Amino acid sequence: MKRLILASVFALGFVGSASAQTADSSPITETIKNQIEAFKMDDFARAFEYASPNIRGLFGTPERFGMMVQNGYPMVWRPADVEFLSLRQRMGRIVQRVQIRDAQGELHQLDYFMIRTGDTWHINGVQMVRIPGVGA
């Protein structure tokens, strides 16, 4: 249920796409990499730190957040391979597309919605993206 709510909240209004020339991809990709590394070690408290204040407020505890990721985004919890694709700006929001190969070899693409809090980038939501020609 939380996954559906989370995906719905962040899927609304993301229609247009433009180049994200104002964003530096390095701190953004490091944030995502660090969260994925924390998930791989089952360090949900550390993974929770990379979530935005809104997401932390939605889930309340690292344990509930970790459970949501394990159940709703298992490819993020235990990826076999992670590749960073395009960084862009949509409707004024910074979106990093990530391709993940899961333990069974299946490819998944996800859009990570990023926000800057002070000098730090945080993950403000993740939405799965349909890959053309896969699973059709």
PLM region spans:
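Positively charged n-region of N-terminal signal peptides that target proteins for export
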Residues: 1-4
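Exposed beta-sheet edge and beta->alpha loop/turn motif
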Residues: 86-136
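Sec/Tat signal peptide C-region and signal peptidase I cleavage site
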Residues: 16-20
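Bacterial N-terminal signal peptides
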Residues: 7-15
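Residue-level detector of flexible, active-site-proximal loop/helix-junction positions
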Residues: 11, 54, 130
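Short solvent-exposed beta->alpha transition segments
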Residues: 23-30, 34, 44-91
